[in-house]
Regions:
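Basic amphipathic alpha-helical segments that dock to polyanions
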Residues: 45-50
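The C-terminal cap of the DNA-recognition helix in HTH/winged-HTH DNA-binding domains
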Residues: 19-22, 33, 51
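A short alpha-helical element within helix-turn-helix/winged-helix DNA-binding domains
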Residues: 26-35
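Beta-hairpin "wing" of winged helix-turn-helix
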Residues: 53-67
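Short amphipathic alpha-helical interface segments
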Residues: 8-22
Length: 141
């Protein structure tokens, strides 16, 4: 699994909105300045986040974006899945993907499917709040 820049930047945007959630709607210009991401890229990413109903927007002078839920109620899995076509570790197990010539007898497919399940399950245990506080990883060596 390789998380693309879209997925990584979506997390940065969601973290920024979470850190400043008391400010109400936040303009993309402000998010751009704080995250050092281009406006053009931000527009594309927040469009996906809005379509997935992870953020809401309003127009006008006080317009911008904000989270629709509390940070503890977002999983990293749901954020990444709205940005990434697929988080599968190999192409042959991607949903709708054309199988390779060896898929019928491939002995590695069960392992890849299990890795995919483990990865997705883990990402669904990590919340946006976990990233904000870092508590989940404190005292781990």
């Amino acid at each position: 699994m390789i998380v693309t820049s879209k997925g990584r930047y979506a997390l940065r945007i969601m973290i920024d909105l979470a850190q400043h959630r008391e400010d109400g709607f936040i303009s993309l210009k402000t998010v751009s300045e704080r995250t050092e991401l281009s406006m053009k890229y931000l527009e594309m990413i927040v469009g996906n986040l809005k379509k997935a109903e992870l953020v809401q927007s309003t127009r006008g002078k006080e317009g911008g974006y904000k989270l629709v839920k509390d940070p503890k109620d977002y999983t990293i899995g749901e954020i990444l899945r709205c940005m990434e076509d697929n988080l599968a570790p190999v192409a042959c197990i991607k949903e709708g993907e054309i199988q390779c010539d060896h898929s019928g007898g491939c002995l590695t497919v069960p392992m890849w499917k299990e890795l995919d399940d483990i990865t997705n399950a883990y990402l669904d245990t990590v919340s946006l709040e976990d990233l904000l506080t870092g508590e989940k990883w404190r005292n781990k060596t």
